[in-house]
Amino acid sequence: MEVEEAAYRTVWSEPPKRPAGRTKFRETRHPVYRGVRRRGGRPGAAGRWVCEVRVPGARGSRLWLGTFATAEAAARAHDAAALALRGRAACLNFADSAWRMPPVPASAALAGARGVRDAVAVAVEAFQRQSAAPSSPAETFANDGDEEEDNKDVLPVAAAEVFDAGAFELDDGFRFGGMDAGSYYASLAQGLLVEPPAAGAWWEDGELAGSDMPLWSY
């Protein structure tokens, strides 16, 4: 697609040699788009836009393509006609017109000016419908999949409440293998041949009785 766009000249790569606008009358030509000028309305006010394109091989001849509501639509019409009349030698207003605009049939170019004008109008209308169409079902499905992936890491509030610290409070029997704290440390001290700590020194009402008391003396 990039190679296809690079094969065409655009108004951005080859700007006009002279400033847009007539010298004897007020400026009506579009400052950027090729083949587009304003029709009616004061400069800066809302108006309609007309488009015309030069006919190859006929010096001074121009093909009238019609009147359009926006300058962009008129510029697209110019590109469609230029592609039909000049092929890869066309200078486009938009680089993507080479692949986004519906092609004008070769039979239309052979039918003369009216055939080209009618085919260009059909191409511009089809392009506008395509641009205004909603996203395809495949894109919608992909977006839904992304939302599901994002929601996987979100923990519901109801589930989070289950992990309250109080719900997992363990008693001494579970901590010390079915024994109370005193019996557990007495058994441990006997295995290590050391004096066990004083009974009741470890837990009192579920909390440490004294944080500065040594575990046991050697």
From Swiss-Prot:
Gene3D superfamilies: AP2/ERF domain. Induction: By cold stress. PROSITE patterns: AP2_ERF (PS51032). One of its GO terms (cellular component) is nucleus. It holds the Pfam family AP2. Residues 1-26, 131-151 are annotated as: Disordered. One of its GO terms (molecular function) is DNA binding. Keywords: Activator, DNA-binding, Nucleus, Stress response, Transcription, Transcription regulation. Residues 32-95 bind DNA. Its main location: nucleus. Transcriptional activator that binds specifically to the DNA sequence 5'-[AG]CCGAC-3'. Binding to the C-repeat/DRE element mediates high salinity- and dehydration-inducible transcription. Confers resistance to high salt, cold and drought stress. Belongs to the AP2/ERF transcription factor family. ERF subfamily. This is Dehydration-responsive element-binding protein 1B. The lineage of its organism: Eukaryota, Viridiplantae, Streptophyta, Embryophyta, Tracheophyta. The gene is DREB1B.
